[in-house]
C-alpha cells in the first residue's frame, strides 16, 4: 500500500480510536491520501468483517477514488473496492468498500435504516456541505442513535470548522500533516467582472502558458463559461502541442476520464473545470491554477417555490482548496483573478446548501425514512421552518405525504426513484406503456441541460420529437446523455423505447402532474400568463406557445416580477382536475357582497356562476372583514359618531379606574366581528350593500356598547352641550389633542357669564373659544372673569370697528346676552 502518503502516519491512530469511539473527525490537506489510503487501512483493522461505505459529493470523484483504491491492492474496481453512482455501479458480492455519491446512501437508509452488514460510513470532503451530505449524516446519526449504536461514522475534510462538528458528534479529532509543495499566489490588480469571466480566464491561461511550465487547471463557474473560454483558447493555441479539455458534471464518464488522465509525452494540458475539480480528484501534472473566484450556486426562492442558479463569489475555504491543486506534485503557481484587498470581504466558509436549497426531495426522503417531522433529526445545520413548510405544501399537492407529514404509498414509490419528487410523480402518474415511455423521455430532458436552449420556442413536445428522431436514426450527438438517462428510467419502469409522434396535450398533462402549481392561463396581452400558484409569467410573443389559452410550464426563470418560460406544453382544461368553491367576497367597486360558485385550478378561476343561497354566517364574516380592511367609512361614520368617540375617550383619560369601553376606531375595526353582526341581520334579512349598511345608525350602535350605568356617568361628566346666558345650548367639543374640552361660542352670547363653565364634576374648565358675529375666533381663554376685566376692552375696540351695527357694551357682566344682532 502507498506508505509514502502522509495519511499513512495516522492509520493506526484511526483504527485505535474507532475501537474506542463511535464517531471520528479526520482532517488532512489535499494530496495527503486520506480518500484513497484511509478506507483501505480501516478495512484492514476490521479483520475481514463488515463493509465500509464512503460518500463523495461528485460522481467523477467517486469513480476515480474507487478505481485508485482498487489499483493500490492490485484489483479492478468492482471486487474488494467498488463504486455506486446514479445509473451506474461496479460492485459485487466481494465488495467491502463501496464509494457512493451522497444521494445513494439516503436511498439505502430509506430502504433499510439498519444498514445491515455495514460497519463504517465515511463522509469524505464534508466541507462542501451539500444538502445530500447533511441529510445523509442526519439520517445516519438517527439510525446510530436508535437502532445501530455499533455503527461507526467518520467525517473527513481538508478545510472545515472541526470544533463545531466534533462537538455535535461527540467525536475526537485526528489531524494529518500534509505534503504540499510551496505555491506562489499572484493576485489581479482589479476584480474580475462575472459577465466577462471567460475572457479574463483565457487571458490568464495564456499568460501562465507563456511564462511557466506544467499543466494548467482553470476554475470557471459553469459549463457555459467553460465552453466560451475553450473556444477562445483552441483558436489561440491552434497548431501547438497544448490540448484544452473541459471538465464538468454533464460530460460523459469517458470524456471525464480522458480529461484527468496524464498528458501524453511532449504535450501540455489545460483543464477548464467547474468546482468539480476542487477536491478528491487527481489531475496528473497540474502545476498552475487559474482561479476565476466565482462559482454557480443554486438559490431557492421561497416566494416562487423555484430554484435558480446564480454566479457568486467563492468563499475563502474554496479558494484555499483551489490553490492547493497547484502544489500536489511540485512547486506551483496560483493566479487569483481578484485583488488582495477584496479577499478580506470574502466569506470564511461556504454556506451549507441546506440553508438555501429546495428541501422537497429531502423532506420526502425523511418521511420515507419514517420521520414525519424533519426538525426531529440531529442536524448539524437545521433547515428553516419556512422552507420545510413550502416543501411539505408541494409534497401534499403531489400526494406524496399526508397532512401529518407521514409518507403515502405513492410517496414511498416516488422516494425510491433517483430523481426529484416532481419527476417521480410524472413517471408514476403515467398509465399506459406509451405514457410511461413518454414520461421517461420528458424526465431526461428536464434533468439535463436543454440541447435546444438557443431555440426561441419553449415547446417541450419539440424536444421530445427531436430526441426520438435522433434516437431512431441512431445519431444522438448532444442528445446522447439525455437518451442514456431516459433508457435508465425505462429500465426502472420496465417499458420499451418508443419513438412514435406524441400528442402535445399529453405532454402538457404529464407536466401538469409534476408541476400542479404551474398550470398557466392566458391573461391580458399575448404571451402573458398567470400560473395556478399565482405568479405572473411571460412567453416570447414569437413563440407559438404564446397563442394557447392553457399551458403547463416545466421550466422558467423566477428572477424578477415576471418569470420567463423556457419549457412548456399546451394542456386541455378537460384533462385537469378542478375544485369547486363558493366564493363570497366584498366587491369594493360595486359596494356589495359578491357571491359566486367557482370552478378553480389552484388560484385560477375556470368558471364562475352567481349564487343566491350562501351561508349567512359566511356573508356576515365577509362584511366584517371588509369593514376591517376598508374602515368605518363603509358605515355611516359621521360627525355624531366621532363626537361620541371623543367624549368617551376624554372620560377614559380623566377616570381610568372606571373601565370605560374602548370605542377607538382602531379597536372597533379590530373587533368588528364582535359588535357588528347583530346589526347586519335584521328581521331575517341581511344588509349586503354599502347603501344598506350606511342606513345603520352607527352612533346608536356604539352607544349601545356602553353599559347603562356608564352611559349615565358619561352624560354627567362629559355632557354634549352646555347652556349659555343667551339661552343657546352650545355643543362642547372634546376634540383630541387638547387638554381641555372646547366651547366655541359667540362672545355676545356670553354677556353676563361671570365664570368659565366646568365639566367632570367641576374638575375640568372648558377652553372658551370666543367668536365674532361672523363666527371667527377672537379670543381663547379658560379664565372668563379675567377676560371681562382686561382683554375684553381691547377686543371690543376691534369688534366695534368691524361690526359697528352690533352692541358692544362697556359693562358686559351687566349686559343682556344676545343671539343675533342687537342694535345700539
Regions found by a protein language model. Name each.
Residues 1-426, 494-498, 538, 555-557, ...:
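P-loop NTPase motor module signature
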Residues 36, 241, 246, 258, ...:
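Second RecA-like catalytic domain
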Residues 82-86, 100, 184-186, 248, ...:
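Residues in well-ordered beta-strands of folded domains
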Residues 122-123, 243, 252, 256, ...:
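Charge-dense polyanion-binding interfaces
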Residues 173-176, 527-532, 720-725:
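Short acidic-hydrophobic surface loop/beta-edge motif
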Residues 324, 552-572, 744-766:
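Short, solvent-exposed cationic patches
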Residues 501, 506, 510-512, 520, ...:
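A positional "C-terminalness" feature that preferentially activates on distal terminal regions of long
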Amino acid at each position: 500500500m502507498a506508505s509514502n502518503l502522509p495519511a499513512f502516519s495516522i492509520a493506526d491512530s484511526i483504527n485505535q480510536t474507532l475501537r474506542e469511539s463511535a464517531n471520528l473527525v479526520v482532517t488532512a490537506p489535499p494530496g495527503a491520501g486520506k480518500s484513497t489510503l484511509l478506507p483501505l487501512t480501516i478495512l484492514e483493522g476490521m479483520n475481514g468483517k463488515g463493509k465500509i461505505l464512503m460518500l463523495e459529493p461528485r460522481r467523477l470523484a467517486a469513480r476515480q477514488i474507487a478505481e485508485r483504491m482498487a489499483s493500490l491492492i492490485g484489483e479492478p474496481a468492482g471486487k474488494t473496492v467498488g463504486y455506486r453512482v446514479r445509473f451506474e455501479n461496479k460492485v459485487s458480492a466481494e465488495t467491502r468498500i463501496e464509494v457512493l455519491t451522497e444521494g445513494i446512501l439516503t436511498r439505502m437508509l430509506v430502504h433499510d435504516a439498519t444498514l445491515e452488514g455495514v460497519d463504517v460510513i465515511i463522509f469524505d470532503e464534508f466541507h462542501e456541505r451539500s444538502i445530500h451530505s447533511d441529510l445523509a449524516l442526519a439520517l445516519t446519526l438517527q439510525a446510530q442513535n436508535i437502532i445501530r449504536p455499533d455503527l461507526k461514522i467518520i467525517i473527513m475534510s481538508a478545510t472545515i470548522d472541526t470544533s463545531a462538528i466534533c462537538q455535535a458528534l461527540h467525536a475526537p479529532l485526528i489531524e494529518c500533516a500534509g505534503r504540499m509543495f510551496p505555491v506562489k499566489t499572484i493576485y489581479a490588480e482589479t476584480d474580475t467582472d462575472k459577465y466577462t469571466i471567460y475572457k479574463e480566464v483565457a487571458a490568464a491561461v495564456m499568460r501562465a502558458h507563456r511564462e511557466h511550465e506544467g499543466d494548467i487547471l482553470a476554475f470557471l463557474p459553469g459549463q457555459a463559461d467553460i465552453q466560451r473560454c475553450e473556444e477562445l483558447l483552441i483558436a489561440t493555441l491552434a497548431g501547438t502541442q497544448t490540448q484544452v479539455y473541459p471538465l464538468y458534471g454533464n460530460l460523459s464518464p469517458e470524456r471525464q476520464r480522458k480529461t484527468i488522465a496524464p498528458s501524453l509525452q511532449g504535450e501540455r494540458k489545460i483543464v477548464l473545470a467547474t468546482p468539480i475539480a476542487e477536491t478528491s480528484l487527481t489531475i496528473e501534472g497540474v502545476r498552475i491554477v487559474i482561479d476565476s473566484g466565482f462559482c454557480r450556486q443554486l438559490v431557492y426562492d421561497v416566494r416562487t417555490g423555484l430554484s435558480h442558479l446564480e454566479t457568486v463569489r467563492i468563499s475563502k475555504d474554496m479558494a484555499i482548496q483551489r490553490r492547493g491543486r497547484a502544489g500536489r506534485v511540485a512547486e506551483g503557481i496560483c493566479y487569483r483573478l481578484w485583488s488582495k484587498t477584496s479577499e478580506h470581504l470574502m466569506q470564511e466558509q461556504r454556506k451549507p446548501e441546506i440553508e438555501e436549497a429546495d428541501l422537497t426531495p429531502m423532506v420526502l426522503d425523511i418521511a420515507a425514512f419514517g420521520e414525519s417531522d424533519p426538525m426531529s433529526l440531529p442536524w448539524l445545520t437545521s433547515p428553516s421552518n419556512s422552507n420545510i413548510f413550502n416543501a411539505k405544501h408541494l409534497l401534499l399537492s403531489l400526494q406524496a405525504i399526508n397532512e401529518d407529514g407521514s409518507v403515502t404509498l405513492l410517496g414511498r414509490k416516488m422516494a425510491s426513484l433517483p430523481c426529484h419528487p416532481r419527476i417521480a410523480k410524472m413517471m408514476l402518474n403515467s398509465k399506459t406503456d406509451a405514457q410511461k415511455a413518454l414520461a421517461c423521455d420528458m424526465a431526461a430532458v428536464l434533468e439535463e441541460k436543454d440541447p435546444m436552449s438557443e431555440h426561441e420556442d419553449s415547446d417541450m413536445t419539440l424536444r421530445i420529437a427531436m430526441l426520438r428522431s435522433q434516437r431512431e436514426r441512431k445519431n444522438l450527438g448532444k442528445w446522447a446523455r439525455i437518451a442514456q438517462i431516459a433508457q435508465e428510467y425505462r429500465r426502472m419502469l420496465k417499458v420499451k423505447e418508443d419513438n412514435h409522434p406524441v400528442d402535445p396535450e399529453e405532454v402538457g398533462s404529464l407536466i401538469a402532474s409534476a408541476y400542479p402549481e404551474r398550470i398557466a392561463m392566458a391573461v391580458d396581452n399575448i404571451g402573458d400568463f398567470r400560473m395556478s400558484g399565482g405568479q405572473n409569467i411571460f412567453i416570447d410573443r414569437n413563440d407559438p406557445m404564446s397563442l394557447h389559452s392553457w399551458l403547463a410550464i416545466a421550466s422558467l426563470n423566477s428572477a424578477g416580477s415576471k418569470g420567463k418560460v423556457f419549457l412548456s406544453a399546451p394542456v386541455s382544461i378537460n384533462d385537469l382536475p378542478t375544485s369547486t368553491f363558493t366564493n363570497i367576497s366584498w366587491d369594493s367597486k360595486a359596494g356589495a357582497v359578491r357571491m359566486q360558485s367557482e370552478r378553480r385550478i389552484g388560484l385560477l378561476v375556470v368558471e364562475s356562476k352567481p349564487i343566491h343561497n350562501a351561508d349567512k354566517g359566511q356573508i356576515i364574516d365577509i362584511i366584517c372583514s371588509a369593514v376591517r380592511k376598508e374602515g368605518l367609512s363603509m358605515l355611516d361614520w359621521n360627525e355624531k359618531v366621532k363626537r361620541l368617540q371623543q367624549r368617551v375617550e376624554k372620560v377614559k383619560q380623566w377616570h381610568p379606574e372606571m373601565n370605560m369601553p374602548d370605542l377607538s376606531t382602531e379597536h372597533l375595526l379590530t373587533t368588528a366581528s364582535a359588535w357588528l353582526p347583530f346589526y347586519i341581520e335584521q328581521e331575517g334579512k341581511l344588509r349586503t350593500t354599502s347603501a344598506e349598511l350606511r342606513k345603520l345608525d352607527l352612533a346608536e350602535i356604539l352607544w349601545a356598547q356602553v353599559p347603562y350605568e356608564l352611559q349615565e356617568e358619561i352624560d354627567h361628566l362629559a355632557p354634549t352641550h352646555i347652556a349659555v346666558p343667551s339661552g343657546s345650548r352650545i355643543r362642547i367639543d372634546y376634540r383630541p389633542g387638547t387638554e381641555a374640552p372646547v366651547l366655541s361660542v359667540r362672545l355676545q352670547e356670553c354677556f353676563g357669564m361671570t365664570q368659565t363653565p366646568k365639566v367632570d364634576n367641576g374638575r375640568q374648565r372648558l377652553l372658551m373659544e370666543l367668536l365674532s358675529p361672523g363666527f371667527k375666533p377672537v379670543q381663547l381663554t379658560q379664565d372668563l372673569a379675567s377676560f371681562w376685566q382686561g382683554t375684553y376692552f381691547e377686543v371690543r375696540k376691534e369688534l366695534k370697528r368691524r361690526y359697528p351695527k352690533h352692541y358692544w357694551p362697556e359693562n358686559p357682566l351687566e349686559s343682556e346676552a344676545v343671539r343675533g344682532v342687537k342694535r345700539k
